[in-house]
Structure formats: C-alpha cells, structure tokens
From Swiss-Prot:
InterPro entries reported in the protein's UniProt record: Peptidase_S1_PA, Peptidase_S1_PA_chymotrypsin, Peptidase_S1A, Trypsin_dom, TRYPSIN_HIS, TRYPSIN_SER
Tissue expression summary: Selectively expressed in uterine mast cells.
Name of the protein this chain belongs to: Mast cell protease 9
Key words, A-Z: Disulfide bond, Hydrolase, Protease, Serine protease, Signal, Zymogen
Active site annotation, chain numbering: 65 (charge relay system), 109 (charge relay system), 202 (charge relay system)
GO MF, any single term: serine-type endopeptidase activity
GO biological process: proteolysis
Organism expressing this protein natively: Mus musculus (Mouse)
Stated family: Belongs to the peptidase S1 family. Granzyme subfamily.
CDD domains linked to this entry: Tryp_SPc
Keyword Signal set for record: yes
Tree of life domain: Eukaryota
Disulfide cysteine pairs (residue numbers): 50-66, 143-208, 174-187
Domain spans labelled Peptidase S1: 21-244
Length: 246
C-alpha cells in the first residue's frame, strides 16, 4: 500500500469509506499496542472511522475533527473485522477539546477521549509516551505513522493495521495549504516518495524514536504528500491537567 492517507473532511459516513496508509506495509500483529480504532456515530446512524492512541489507561488521543456525540474505541486490534481475543471495546464517556481548537483552520486539532472504564494493559494494549512541552520534532527526522485507512484514493479501507515510514519536511512544503503554522503543526511526507496518510487515518499518531509527536490531521484530496499533523508538544501541559482531572 502507498502511504497513510488522511481523513480530510470532518466525519465521513461508513458508506463513503475512509482512507488508510499509502505506500506502507501491514504491521506485525499487536506490535503497536497503543493503537486505537475509533468509531463515531452520527445522529443519522452513519459511522466515521478514525485512528487514535492510548496515552493513559483511561484516555485515548485523536484528532478533534473525529469527535462526535457517540463514540466507541477498540484497543488491542490488528484485524478490525475479526473478534480477536486481544481486543477491548470500550465506550467513550466524554471528549475534551482544547480551549483553542479552530474548526476552520484545523489549528489545535486534538481531542482527549475519556473512556467509561480503564483499559486493561496487556502485551496487546499499552500506552505510548508523549514528548515534553519543549520537544520539537525537526525536519529531516524519520518517523512512523499507522492506521486502518484506505490504501489509495479509490480503494477501500484496510481491515488490518498498516504502517509507513515518513519524513518530517520543512514548513515551506506545507505552504500549499491555506492554513499551516509550524509551531502548532508538523509538515510530513516527501514529495519524492509515494507515501502518506489519508482518509481513515485521521487521529492516528506520528511516532519519532518511539514517542508520539503528532496526530494525523489533514492533507490533499489526491493523497499526495505532504500531510499535516497536529504537533503534540505544545499541548502537553493541558493534556496532563486533563488526565489529572484538574
């Protein structure tokens, strides 16, 4: 498959499909135990699919544009079409948006999902470390993204988790987008490679040296890189306050 494709709109109904990793490979089953498969149900019964990742036993992080009135999270999954014994399906009690989330610009496209109960941490379900508030993922860094999104613009979603290696590039490459701010976002994906994220991958993590530095946020309609990821480090103080219940 090519690279990770982004979920570009707000929420896509399941009948429309959701996109996945482009230019990547199928992940080794349960090798990324922090990954979460997020389902958001609309008032009309449509289901939007996003990625997410476990940052504390009772909290999953995903993109703000993936949030909705009724949500469930599946942890410990590799093939989401199967009932794997490792899976834990938990309803979302509530979602917490940052005070400065901007719907139109997608700045601060991050949300915390508080689960109705704590996840049972196992070899297939575990938390991922976050960066420090001053940690700044820099251009040239090689990172990994993963998700269940489409493998191509005209292809269906993937039932198994896929991953792709992506390079952080300079902010100049993301000037093609109407809204981009390097202090809040990360520009990811080289134009010389057929690798990126797309619909259905939204909300998934960007891991650099084992640390979650970004969240799949938005990209181009043709699925060509670069793509925009929300930068996590500026939100770490807020994240810590939410987890502590402050």
């Amino acid at each position: 498959m090519q690279a990770l494709l982004f979920l570009m709109a707000l929420l896509l109904p399941s009948r429309a499909g959701a996109e996945e990793i482009i230019g990547g490979v199928e992940s080794e089953p349960h090798s990324r135990p922090y990954m979460a498969y997020v389902n958001t149900f609309s008032k009309k019964g449509y289901v939007a699919i996003c990625g997410g990742f476990l940052i504390a036993p009772q909290f999953v992080m995903t993109a703000a544009h993936c949030s909705g009135r009724r949500m469930t999270v599946t942890l410990g999954a590799h093939n989401v079409r199967k009932r794997e014994c490792t899976q834990q399906k938990i309803k979302v009690e509530k979602y917490i948006l940052p005070p400065n989330y901007n719907v139109s610009s997608k700045f601060n496209d991050i949300v915390l999902l508080k689960l109705k109960k704590q996840a049972n941490l196992t070899s297939a379900v575990d938390v991922v470390p976050l960066p420090g508030p001053s940690d700044f993922a820099k251009p040239g860094t090689m990172c990994w993204a993963a998700g269940w999104g489409r493998t191509g613009v005209k292809k269906s979603i993937s039932h198994t988790l896929r991953e792709v290696e992506l390079k952080i590039v300079g902010e100049k490459a993301c000037k093609i987008f109407r809204h981009y701010k390097d202090s809040l976002q990360i520009c990811v994906g080289s134009s010389t490679k057929v690798a990126s994220v797309y619909m259905g991958d939204s909300g998934g993590p960007l891991l650099c040296a084992g640390v979650a530095h970004g969240i799949v946020s938005s990209g181009r309609g043709n699925a060509k890189p670069p793509a925009i990821f929300t930068r996590i480090s500026p939100h770490v103080p807020w994240i810590n306050r939410v987890i502590k219940g402050e």
